[in-house]
Amino acid sequence: MKDSVIRKLEGLLERNEEVLALLSDPSVIADQERFRALSKEYSQLEDVVKSFTAFQQATEDLEAAKEMLNEDDPELKEMAQEEMKEAKSVLETLEDELQILLLPKDPNDDNNAFIEIRAGAGGDEAAIFAGDLFRMYSKYSESNRWQIEVMNTNEGEHGGFKEVIAKISGEGVYGKLKFESGGHRVQRVPETESQGRVHTSACTVIVLPEIPEAEAIEINKADLKVDTFRASGAGGQHVNKTDSAIRITHIPTGIVVECQDQRSQHKNRAQAMSVLSARIQAVEDEKRRSEEESTRRNLVSSGDRSERIRTYNFPQGRMSDHRINLTLYRLNEVMEGVLDVIIEPLILENQADLLAALAED
């Protein structure tokens, strides 16, 4: 391992000890905000510290085995060779592990997320597929013990959704779901199709990290236009007699957010502001990325939300992710929420891309 990497790891080890000492400091314990921030940092350092400590131990074992080679006893020499072989194998594994742990982390990976699914080309069939996608993500959330809370729906005339927005809360939600942003295409025979012809329709999925209140960008109230209206259900009928639904327009960006799934106007407004904050933050992040972008671009992109990323072919039972040329004939499982078979390869491909970028630098 390079000396520069070793020095960086030693620095993280020292920082871990500092943070541990600070967490037992009464003045830090009294300051809840600082205590939470340090607790989070300590948790983030845990894996790299554990791996580097094991790496240091394996390095010592290797040096001790090398010294044993100088012994005259043939049995000790043989033992030393075995120990050297084992230590080298452990070091190789730990070096790969540490390289991954040192990769730049998306600060939002541990955050909750908002997921927005919109029917695109394909009319009723696109809306039905949007409903299928929402069910798929709901099943995946359940398997991870995440909570899913519907914030806004616009139901399709023959089932599904023209649009559905939900908040998913739990550990590492955004880090797992962020690569789902993009165009999702479906190829299947609609139930209403009498000739058995395969139709193609599409949906767009957007995944945004929830921005913690302390980190949220400040939104000027003068930049907001707030409208209230009656919440409506399927077919457009009004489902209550009070103006509990909220529509907020952010005038500078033109972003519009509607929330009507809560009975309380206050709750709908709070949820709408939360989604608005996430969308504005996403616009700012995209602008910054565009300014910083070099010729190199990540293979697995969570940025271009209009790009077609995946095809679900029902007649063939096939799911293809076009970003990493992954094809699986496990469509029924995927639609039942078995998504790690797609998500894990995407995460690994992203890590490989980041490693390649670091090597170039």
Curated annotation (Swiss-Prot):
Keyword Protein biosynthesis appears in the UniProt entry: yes
Keyword match Endoplasmic reticulum: no
PROSITE patterns hit by this protein: RF_PROK_I
Main location: cytoplasm
Keywords, sorted A to Z: Cytoplasm, Methylation, Protein biosynthesis
Compartments reported by the entry: Cytoplasm
Gene Ontology CC annotation, any one: cytoplasm
Basic and acidic residues composition bias: residue spans: 283-296
Region (Disordered): 283-305
Modified residues (N5-methylglutamine): 237
Entries under InterPro entries matching the protein: PCRF, Pep_chain_release_fac_I, Pep_chain_release_fac_I_sf, Prokaryotic/Mito_RF, RF-1
UniProt GO MF annotations: translation release factor activity, codon specific
Entry comment on modification after translation: Methylated by PrmC. Methylation increases the termination efficiency of RF1.
Signal peptide: none
Family to which the UniProt record says this protein belongs: Belongs to the prokaryotic/mitochondrial release factor family.
Function: Peptide chain release factor 1 directs the termination of translation in response to the peptide chain termination codons UAG and UAA.
NCBIfam families cross-referenced by the UniProt entry: prfA, PRK00591.1
Name of the protein described by the UniProt record: Peptide chain release factor 1
Annotated organism of origin: Shewanella woodyi (strain ATCC 51908 / MS32)
Annotated gene: prfA
